[in-house]
Amino acid sequence: MKRREFIKSAALGSMGGLLISQTFGAQAGGNMLTPREVEGPFYPITPQKDKDADLTQIEGKVGRAKGTIIDIFGQVFDQDGNAIEDVTIDLWQANSYGKYHHPHDNSEAPIDPHFQGWAILQSGKQGRFKFKTVMPGAYPLNSPQQRTPHIHIKISKYGYESLLTQLYFPDQPLNDKDGLFKRKSVQEQKMMTAKKTSKSNEYRYDIFLQKAF
Ligand SMILES: [Fe+2]
């Protein structure tokens, strides 16, 4: 190969690499996309009527979920930072004892009859969403796979790559020991971790989706 051709092909090669890293890597349009995570075994399979944004109360029941009540809000954006409305946000989590309302969760942690455990929300104006829940418990110590507190989320809207992820919380001592969390890069961990606001028990969590076409 002549020197000039070699330089040209090397330049094209590195450009190709750049394009690939923009498409499949973390960086797109200046914003990092929310990283993906596995679904886990406990996506709800028992039908339930109440899937609203307050997971601390079940419609028609008197009483409130046990644990620390927390508020989470945020916005959904595309990779260019445009807010996306009408995005479906389907989320589920363990109760404050670390137990899922799922027939396959056979840990000895108690069920909380007042905890809703599952919500399906839509992002509204400017892609905003919010929900009230309890701080999920770590899976019990006797569970074979101990997990740090997390919330599972499935996000979908026509025209965007659907996203399956998990939300984490800052300053959780188990984060460093969590098998799934540890596998992520520092930057990915940052994207997946809600940020504490100045209000007590309130967190901000923004979601970045990839346009499908
Ligand atoms: Fe989980």
State each model region's role.
Residues 1-18:
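N-terminal secretory signal peptides and thylakoid transit peptides that target proteins
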Residues 20-23:
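N-terminal signal peptide c-region/cleavage motif recognized by signal peptidases
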Residues 28-192, 196-213:
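Beta-strand-dominated extracellular/periplasmic modules and repeats
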